[in-house]
């Protein structure tokens, strides 16, 4: 809230209580994040104008473990990785995923609250970089 107190029913407040329960039992929760998202060859505005029908993905076939396909998205993925590293979020890897245009980024594990914060930041960075690249 505006007094810097936790809101008891917020996701952050709930997570803090769960972490405290773990600590009281002698455990430490460590978490990692694997985020998957799609890259499109159209802007958000263009996709919206088409009523979100048939957006043009950056890839055209299954990308999972296809090292040649991911070179097409590498400028965007490199920018995402570099920006995350620059703000202190350690990226372990990124790769193309199953669906056309689907990407994955994995970050190193850390404590639960830090990972929750990082997860939100990673999503924001990925959206903004993708928006910049169109």
Question: Where do the protein language model's features map onto the residues?
Answer:
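Glycine-rich, acidic/polar active-site loops that bind/position phosphate-bearing ligands
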Residues: 1-134
